[in-house]
């Protein structure tokens, strides 16, 4: 519990460094401000990518949108390929996870029409293609987790898995899926 609290406090402190960011108490005035927050952070979302196989990019069920696994796809191309610890550095893997998170948000916006409808990032499932012996999967997926908290504040705190994989589609180093609650 103490480790989780320390991690949460670190992420929230980093997110709150910008004085215009809603505080970690879950400011109700956040509605209508997510696009403004993205601009404030200098973040531009990519276009939501179409599915490349026999699946859909998202499914809405009740008050949740389930986002299919997103890879580090940017400007029409895969941004990173290879295994972490070989062709991909830890820093590049963290950035790849961040790109995956941006693609998750692009899919959420396509599904919901407006990211202001998001009430909670419920869960991220992270997969890391890495060399044998690599164990820093949580550090890699923090690239996505940190971004969610930077954008959504306390609503961005989520459950998560971060696991290793012997390979991922298109040879990417990271793939992340998500469950997002909305109104």
What is the predicted function of each stretch?
Residues 9, 18-21, 42, 53:
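Generic N-terminal simple sequence motifs
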Residues 17-29:
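Short, Lys/Arg-enriched N-terminal segments with co-localized hydrophobic residues
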Residues 30-183:
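Short, polar/acidic, helix-capping and beta-turn segments at strand->helix junctions
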Residues 5-8, 12:
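Residue-level detector of alpha-helical secondary structure
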């Amino acid at each position: 519990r103490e480790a989780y609290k320390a991690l949460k406090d670190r992420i929230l402190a980093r997110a709150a460094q910008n004085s215009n960011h809603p505080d970690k108490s879950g400011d109700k005035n956040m509605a209508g401000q997510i696009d403004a927050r993205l601009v404030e952070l200098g973040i531009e979302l990519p276009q939501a990518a179409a599915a490349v196989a026999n699946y859909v990019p998202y499914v809405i069920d009740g008050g949740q949108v389930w986002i299919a696994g997103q890879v580090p796809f940017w400007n029409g191309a895969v941004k990173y390929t290879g295994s972490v610890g070989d062709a991909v550095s830890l820093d590049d893997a963290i950035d790849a996870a961040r790109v995956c998170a941006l693609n998750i948000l692009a899919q959420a916006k396509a599904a919901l029409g407006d990211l202001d409808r998001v009430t909670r990032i419920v869960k991220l499932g992270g997969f890391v293609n890495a060399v044998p012996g690599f164990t820093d999967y949580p550090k890699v997926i923090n690239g996505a987790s940190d971004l969610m908290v930077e954008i959504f504040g306390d609503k961005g705190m989520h459950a998560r898995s971060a696991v290793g994989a012997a390979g991922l589609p298109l040879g990417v180093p990271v793939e992340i899926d998500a469950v997002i609650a909305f109104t």
